[in-house]
Amino acid sequence: MEHTSTRIKSVETLLTILEFMKGRESVTITECAEELDLANSTVHKHLSSIKDARLVVQEGTEYRLGLGFLTYGIAVRNLFPIYDLAQDAMDELADETGERIWLKVEENGFEIPIAKRGGQHAIHDHDIG
């Protein structure tokens, strides 16, 4: 991450922790602290701060990303009028071709999938969209 005088260090630390957790089933405070070269107390404070918002879930001594993030993602996705407009066309195209159909939008130069439909011949995966 770029460090400038306008950045908030604690927010950057939290984002670094969340990025570390992404793609992992769960992490312990110690594992996260050691990997990111942070104090255990720092990791604990950050995770505790977002636990009530369901952004992380604590199960014993382990933490995982929570479904609270999903509600933010769905809210953002629903801001795109094309999401609702494309549903019927995506279903029809998936039925006609038997293939997986993706609806993607551009954001900051990146292609972001916001919906998908699986045809009868599509290989299924576990992503949400």
Feature roles, as predicted:
Residues 1-80:
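N-terminal helix-turn-helix
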Residues 74-129:
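Amphipathic alpha-helical effector-binding/dimerization core
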